[in-house]
Amino acid sequence: MTESGDDHPRRLRVSKELRGLIRNLHPDLKRKVRAALKENLRDPGVGKPLREELGGLRSFRVGRIRIIYRDSAPHIDLVALGPRRQIYADTLRLLKRAR
């Protein structure tokens, strides 16, 4: 997914696992997630900056789902996607495993 704006094309990088997760969402939610990701490509600052151990990441809400990402210009790396009640703990575990 690419979005051009102000002569600075941005690219969204999504793992196969997250692509599969998005693909299996309910069609209405999938449409909302894709629209939100396009908005994020236009303005990566739309999300809320996360703090402490998740510092450097940002989060934005799509219904009950939170999308966690990292702005690594010229890319935006999609890190995680899931319900608020567990996504932050899941993301922290994922990051610790990756170290």
Task: For each feature predicted by the language model, list its residue ranges.
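Active-site micro-motifs of SAM-dependent methyltransferase domains
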Residues: 20, 39, 86
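Short, intrinsically disordered, mixed-charge
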Residues: 27, 39-42, 93
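A short, surface-exposed loop/turn module that caps and links secondary-structure elements
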Residues: 35-61
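Internal amphipathic alpha-helical segments of the cytochrome P450 catalytic fold
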Residues: 30, 47, 75-78
